[in-house]
């Protein structure tokens, strides 16, 4: 679901970025005013979890892959507004340092996964848990269903963004300039991936975490809670550490996620066959789309595909990338908190 550079026209990128900016602004104001910045440690924890869980790729029939995104647990623990910066920070680190998601498509990816996904998940969870006790089984089930709904809402929006490209952005001969597949292909392909494997993974991860938190940290599930002491998060950070160690399991699933093919896939016989196999047998247009070629190489991530060039062992490189990503998230949010505190004192 991470849209790379080259798949969306500059107009689409500008529109989706502009649509996301108000949500970033309001969410940061709410985080600062309503929560007084005291929940930032939990925001950092959720952002780190989202970053790492997205590294666990799962095989999809047709030769592609998908993953959970942490959308549901972000909505449950933080609420829809604080989830926006949490997921956005994870997506920013992924795009800049690891080339997972495009720089030009950053606004679109945030709109899908950091705004729409958590908003839908939070709405479903709030509706389904009204009047339910913190330790009730209903909260576990609704957390899973909410995460499933949020992930699929994000995937549907991404599919629409992919699918409208050939309709609005093509050359004089009708050849697509950016994403090659129309809505009739993009929507079913993304639905197959996220209504099944990815959605099930998001459901299981979120429901499992909520069930565990009911026993270990039930105060985190309270809608109007006081900020937890940092030591109350230690077990959660230990869990993220365990996920970092286990993240090379995400390398087992071969293939590329739908809509994330590289330039070489458009021009090689094997790549084109893989694209067609994942798209209901519909072959992509011949050649590399012109607009795609101009944007795809706009940014070269220093550690593309979570594979540091200086590490020859792929699993070790994957773990080091996960550690670096988590460290950057914590440092970035910590720096933000420090600057906010200095601003308050100066004011």
From Swiss-Prot:
UniProt keyword list: Cell inner membrane, Cell membrane, Ion transport, Membrane, Nickel, Nickel transport, Transmembrane, Transmembrane helix, Transport
Domain of life per record: Bacteria
Transmembrane region(s): 6-26, 40-60, 73-93, 96-116, 140-160, 185-205, 236-256, 273-293, 319-339
Gene3D superfamilies: 1.10.1760.20
Location, primary (coarse class): membrane
InterPro entries linked to this entry: CbiM/NikMN, PDGLE_dom
Quaternary assembly: Forms an energy-coupling factor (ECF) transporter complex composed of an ATP-binding protein (A component, NikO), a transmembrane protein (T component, NikQ) and a fused possible substrate-capture protein (S component, NikMN) of unknown stoichimetry.
Function (record text): Part of the energy-coupling factor (ECF) transporter complex NikMNQO involved in nickel import. The complex confers nickel uptake upon expression in E.coli; can also transport cobalt with a very low affinity.
Protein name: Fused nickel transport protein NikMN
Lineage summary: Bacteria, Pseudomonadati, Pseudomonadota, Alphaproteobacteria, Rhodobacterales
